């Protein structure tokens, strides 16, 4: 009985993936379509959005990061889907 209970606990932990994984937007446009999310790698606990002007366009990069880059036009956040 104890073996069965232990097996169920292990299977539950594996199936639920108790390790938290961050999800960030990855599109390179001003607005993103629904579902354009990336599951970040282990250790990447921030989402970021970097924008800058190039010629007559605004360029945007979004993604995951292990640290928050301290640049002028970078927005960082630490919740899922927050780098709008």
From Swiss-Prot:
- Which stretch is the leader sequence? 1-21
Report the SS bond pairs. 24-47, 27-32, 40-64, 68-76, 77-82
Which GO molecular function entries does the Swiss-Prot or TrEMBL record give?
Answer: acetylcholine receptor inhibitor activity; ion channel regulator activity; toxin activity
Q: In which tissues is it expressed?
A: Expressed by the venom gland.
Localization in the cell: Secreted
Listed Pfam families: Toxin_cobra-type
- SUPFAM superfamilies in the cross-refs: Snake toxin-like
Provide the Gene Ontology terms for cellular component. Answer: extracellular region
Family membership, please give it: Belongs to the three-finger toxin family. Ancestral subfamily. Orphan group IV sub-subfamily.
Q: What does this protein do?
A: Binds and inhibits muscular and neuronal nicotinic acetylcholine receptors (nAChR).
* Protein's recorded name: Neurotoxin BM10-1-like
According to its UniProt entry, this protein's organism is Bungarus multicinctus (Many-banded krait)
